[in-house]
Regions:
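Class I Rossmann-like S-adenosyl-L-methionine
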Residues: 1-188
C-alpha cells in the first residue's frame, strides 16, 4: 500500500522540483531511509536523466495540454514511462503503482488518463526502444550536430551511456590487498 512517504511519491516530488521549478536534483529532499531511499533516488535520477526522451514519448499521447496546476501529472507520466522503458520493474506493477500515486496526490480523477497513457507506452515499447533518441535538449543536439556533423550521433549516444565506476584507493592502503577484498565480495 502506497502512502505519501512512499518511494514513488518522493521521487515524483523530486522530479517536479527539477522539471517544474527548475531546481537541482541535489536540492531535492529525500525524507526516507533504507531501501526506499535508494529506490526513490534511482527513480528520480533515472527519470531526470532520460527526461527529454520520456517527454518526447509522452507529449504526443496527451490529447489536450495539461493545465498549469496539473503539470505534476506530466511528471508522474515521466516517472511511469521511465519504469516501463528503462527498468526491470514489472510493467503491470509500474503502471498500477503510478496510477496509485495519482490518488495519493489528490488527483483520483486522473487515474484513467494515467493508466491509458502508460498502457499505450507499454504496448508500443518495442517501437519506442528501437527508435533513435538522444535524451538531450534540442538546443544542445543542434549545437553538437552543427559543430560535429559527422560524429554527432556517436557523441550523443556515448553521452547517454552510464559512466563506469572507478575506485581510487588511498595511498596508505595496500592496493593489492584491497583488490583481494573486493574480489572476495564478488566485486569486479
Amino acid at each position: 500500500m502506497l502512502n505519501k512517504d512512499s518511494a514513488r511519491v518522493i521521487a515524483l516530488k523530486a522530479i517536479c522540483l527539477v522539471a517544474l521549478e527548475k531546481r537541482s536534483l541535489s536540492e531535492s529532499l529525500f525524507p526516507i531511509h533504507g531501501d526506499d531511499l535508494s529506490f526513490a533516488k534511482s527513480l528520480a535520477f533515472g527519470s531526470i536523466r532520460f527526461y527529454h526522451h520520456l517527454n518526447d514519448i509522452i507529449t504526443p499521447r496527451i490529447k489536450k495540454p495539461l493545465e498549469k496546476k496539473n503539470l505534476d501529472l506530466h511528471c508522474l507520466l515521466v516517472l511511469g514511462a521511465y519504469q516501463i522503458i528503462y527498468t526491470d520493474i514489472s510493467k503491470h506493477a509500474a503502471i498500477n503503482e503510478t496510477v496509485e500515486v495519482a490518488k495519493i496526490i489528490d488527483k483520483p480523477w486522473a487515474t484513467g488518463f494515467i493508466n491509458a497513457v502508460l498502457r499505450g507506452i507499454d504496448r508500443e515499447q518495442k517501437v519506442i526502444i528501437e527508435s533513435k533518441h538522444f535524451s538531450h535538449p534540442s538546443w544542445l543536439i543542434k549545437k553538437i550536430k552543427k559543430d560535429y556533423p559527422e560524429d554527432y550521433e556517436n557523441i550523443l549516444t556515448e553521452n547517454n551511456r552510464k559512466a563506469p565506476l572507478s575506485i581510487r584507493v588511498h595511498p596508505s592502503i595496500d592496493r593489492d590487498e584491497f583488490q583481494k577484498e573486493l574480489e572476495e565480495l564478488n566485486i569486479h
